[in-house]
């Protein structure tokens, strides 16, 4: 069993099961769950900038004063770029990389897609938009012992309820990474943001084995994730260091699937598609 989670009161509004959240809501939630990282980075800037400014004023050192001003400007510029980057990933432009991912996997028509995630149903909605004839079986796969290494995961889970607004989207819950779906019942499985939070050394391997089990012969595996690179570092800050590297995802997928393809979206999202053996 997972460790019990104490109820937390959030000042960001939670979703309603019977109503699809807007792209603005998803962007706002991404900003909200990143608040700890923003504050941590802000403290570093303040710890350097305030003393510099004080030294410049007290000792009449223009260089120190203007260095503090420049530091503040850099901080504001990085914040603005981060907020814009999050919007491109989680706001309205996010549909573009999901569409490109579906094209990379050559999916179309009346397919059945398993959306495997850790508590956000955003991916299911986007898949239903890009594949208007598809049935989306969205499965909450989060079942990790103890606390998440990233507090944002629990925030994400607290704020979004399983959807009931779209008849083509059916929500399920995995049991210790065992999927409640029959063998060879899906044309594709999709893993999205947050998959890197599922630990290696057992849990991740089991979940991808389950994905293979529910895929029909020739079925597709799709994956979109944050990369470990300079672009994502500017958007997310040092927290990006704990995500899985592109090379590691590529190796992991090639060990389990055939014809693995890779593409990079303009929103700094890594895209992978492969075929069941």
Label each region the model flagged.
Residues 177-189:
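A short acidic, Gly/Pro-enriched loop at the edge of an enzyme's catalytic core
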Residues 240-257, 262:
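Short alpha-helix
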Residues 204-217:
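A short glycine-rich, Lys/Arg-flanked "PGG" loop and its adjoining helix->strand segment in the class I
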Residues 28-47, 57-106:
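Class I SAM-dependent methyltransferase Rossmann-like catalytic core
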Residues 218-225:
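Conserved beta-strand signature within the Rossmann-like core of class I S-adenosyl-L-methionine
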Residues 258-277:
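Core SAM-dependent methyltransferase catalytic element
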Residues 109-120:
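Conserved class I S-adenosyl-L-methionine
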Residues 120-178:
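Class I SAM-dependent methyltransferase SAM/SAH-binding core
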């Amino acid at each position: 069993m997972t460790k019990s989670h104490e109820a937390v009161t959030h000042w960001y509004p939670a979703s309603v099961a019977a109503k699809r959240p807007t792209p603005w809501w998803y962007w706002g939630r991404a900003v909200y769950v990143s608040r700890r990282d923003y504050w941590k980075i802000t403290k570093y800037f303040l710890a350097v900038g305030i003393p510099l400014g004080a030294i410049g004023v007290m000792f009449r050192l223009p260089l120190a004063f203007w260095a503090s001003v420049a530091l503040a400007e850099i901080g504001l510029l990085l914040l603005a770029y981060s907020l814009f980057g999050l919007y491109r990933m989680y706001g309205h432009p996010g549909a573009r990389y999901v569409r490109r991912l579906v094209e990379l996997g050559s999916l179309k028509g009346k397919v059945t897609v398993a959306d495997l995630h850790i508590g956000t149903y955003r991916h299911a909605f986007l898949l239903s938009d890009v594949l208007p004839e598809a049935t989306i079986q969205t499965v909450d796969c989060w079942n990790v012992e103890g606390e998440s290494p990233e507090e944002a995961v629990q925030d994400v889970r607290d704020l979004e309820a399983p959807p009931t607004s779209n008849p083509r989207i059916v929500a399920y819950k995995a049991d210790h990474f065992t999927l409640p779906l029959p063998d060879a019942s899906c044309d594709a499985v999709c893993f999205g943001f947050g998959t890197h939070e599922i630990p290696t050394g057992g849990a991740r391997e089991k979940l991808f084995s389950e994905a293979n089990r529910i895929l029909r012969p020739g079925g597709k595996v799709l994956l979109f994730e944050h990369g470990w690179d300079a672009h994502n570092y500017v958007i997310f800050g040092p927290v990006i260091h704990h995500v899985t590297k592109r090379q590691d995802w590529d190796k992991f997928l090639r060990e389990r699937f055939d014809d693995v393809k890779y593409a990079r979206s303009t929103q700094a999202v890594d895209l992978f598609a492969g075929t069941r053996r």
